[in-house]
């Protein structure tokens, strides 16, 4: 599988106070340990770095992301993301700007989204976005 892992799942995986790994965290851990391709984008890296405090956490994030390919949006991705958001809005689903762009990157690069964010489930019902299921 080719997986795009959203900020929500990385955050769950790195929380100190998590009781037990969720099914999505297990999916991430299995993918990283196996032959699955795990990719991300600079926006996710930035959100993670902004959300965790301290030099140890920062170093951990940078180390983990050093081996993860980052997909980079281009002009066409931004245009398509706007179209995706408008399509969803016309059907009553509000999509945030970043979520729209992440969904578009998954669609363009044939990646399955791994996210704990329910908004992506709504996007997937209205667009070609595919969600990875644990």
Placement of each model-derived feature along the sequence:
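Acidic, PIN/NYN-like endoribonuclease modules and their adjacent C-terminal/linker elements
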Residues: 2, 103, 107-134
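A secondary-structure boundary/capping signal
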Residues: 6, 41-44, 116
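A generic structural signal for short hydrophobic patches within well-formed alpha-helices
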Residues: 10, 45-48, 120
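A general structural signal for well-ordered alpha-helical segments in protein cores
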Residues: 25, 45, 58-61, 78-81, ...
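Active-site neighborhoods of divalent-metal-dependent phosphate/nucleic-acid chemistry enzymes
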Residues: 69-116
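General small-molecule cofactor/ligand-binding pocket signal
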Residues: 39, 71, 132
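Structured helix-beta-strand junction loops
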Residues: 34-35, 64-68, 91, 109, ...
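Short, well-structured N-terminal submotif of metal-dependent ribonuclease cores
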Residues: 1-39, 50-63
């Amino acid at each position: 599988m080719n997986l795009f892992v959203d900020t929500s799942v990385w955050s769950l995986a790195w929380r100190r106070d998590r009781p037990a790994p969720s099914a999505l965290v297990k999916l991430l851990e299995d993918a990283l340990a196996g032959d699955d391709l795990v990719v991300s984008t600079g926006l996710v890296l930035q959100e993670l770095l902004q959300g965790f405090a301290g030099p140890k956490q920062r170093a951990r994030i940078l180390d983990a992301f050093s081996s993860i390919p980052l997909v980079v949006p281009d002009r066409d991705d931004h245009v398509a993301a706007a179209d995706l958001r408008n399509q969803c809005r016309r059907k009553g689903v509000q999509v945030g700007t970043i979520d729209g762009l992440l969904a578009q990157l998954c669609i363009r690069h044939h990646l399955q989204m791994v996210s704990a964010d329910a908004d992506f489930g709504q996007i997937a019902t209205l667009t070609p976005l595919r969600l990875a299921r644990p």
